[in-house]
Amino acid sequence: MALSKKRFIIAAVLMIIITAAAVLISFMSAPYLVMYVSDTNTRYITQKAEDGLMFSVEFIHSVNQTPVKDTYIIENEQIRAYSTTYRSFGAGVQTALDDGQTMTYDDDGNMVITGFDITYNPLRYIVGTVSDHILTIDDKEISLRDLCGRNAKVVFEITTPFEILTKGLL
């Protein structure tokens, strides 16, 4: 009788360990969108990378000195270019449409190009020294200059909690 009880306890403990391991593996492999500074590995944003999640980065273009807004969408654990919005043609901005792209105008008269077939992982920006880069995610506007500093090398990446730990992202 004592042997049977001991086997039952061992079996129960093993089941708990196996269940905990399965939950941990599931959690550790779930995709997350992270934003960090590559020079310091300081992580500022960690958000579940669910399909349809959108974010944008808006800045003043360094050459033509007008606002540009790049919008991205998460699809199939990838960061995909969704649209680019800008006010005027000029050096450094797209002047012709590629196959599958369309251009419309928003309510403010800005040009909006959609239909991109470009994915990034990682997506990189260098925060401006003169003008800021504004991240919009979950209807929140975040100054990347205030958050990360001027000239910060910002990286957006789809990764897992396990990879976050192994890369040393603080």
What residue spans do the PLM features occupy?
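Aromatic-capped interface at the extracytoplasmic side
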Residues: A22-D39
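Short, Lys/Arg-rich N-terminal segment immediately upstream of the first membrane anchor
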Residues: M1-R7
